[in-house]
Amino acid sequence: MSLMDPLANALNHVSNCEGVGKNVAYLKPASKLIGRVLKVMQDQGYIGNFEYIEDGKAGVYKVDLIGQINKCGAVKPRYAVKYQEFEKFEKRYLPAKGFGLLIVSTPKGLMTHDEARTAGVGGRLISYVY
């Protein structure tokens, strides 16, 4: 059986593990996109450390959870958004203004919607976390 969206599966697994109070989540299969999303989440203080573990197949990410995530998930379809339009999607995916973040894939790499707005670049919405 193949996964249709490994990123959505990984974020759903993180959200479920946070919900039941686990301290560690193991995400597989691992990919560069999942690693970059985890890095943004770590930089913003939603997760602790994470590490890549080679298992001879697709690899595994071990993520230390710190109890900061209420909900996280992938945005589907991946909307193309101009930096002036982030507020519309904040209202759709986040519970309140200034609470949580949208992760955006831009030509300058993955970043939060606030960083993209400050840099003046748009991109595709990848996920949300709050």
From Swiss-Prot:
Keywords: Ribonucleoprotein, Ribosomal protein, RNA-binding, rRNA-binding
InterPro entries named among the record's database cross-references: Ribosomal_uS8, Ribosomal_uS8_CS, Ribosomal_uS8_sf
Signal peptide feature range: none
Gene Ontology CC annotation, any one: ribonucleoprotein complex
Any one biological process term the GO annotation gives: translation
GO MF annotations, alphabetized: rRNA binding; structural constituent of ribosome
Pfam family, one: Ribosomal_S8
Annotated HAMAP family: Ribosomal_uS8_A
Stored PANTHER family: 40S RIBOSOMAL PROTEIN S15A
NCBIfam families: PRK04034.1
Assembly behavior: Part of the 30S ribosomal subunit.
Family, per entry: Belongs to the universal ribosomal protein uS8 family.
Protein's job: One of the primary rRNA binding proteins, it binds directly to 16S rRNA central domain where it helps coordinate assembly of the platform of the 30S subunit.
Protein name: Small ribosomal subunit protein uS8
Source organism: Methanococcus vannielii (strain ATCC 35089 / DSM 1224 / JCM 13029 / OCM 148 / SB)
Taxonomic placement: Archaea, Methanobacteriati, Methanobacteriota, Methanomada group, Methanococci
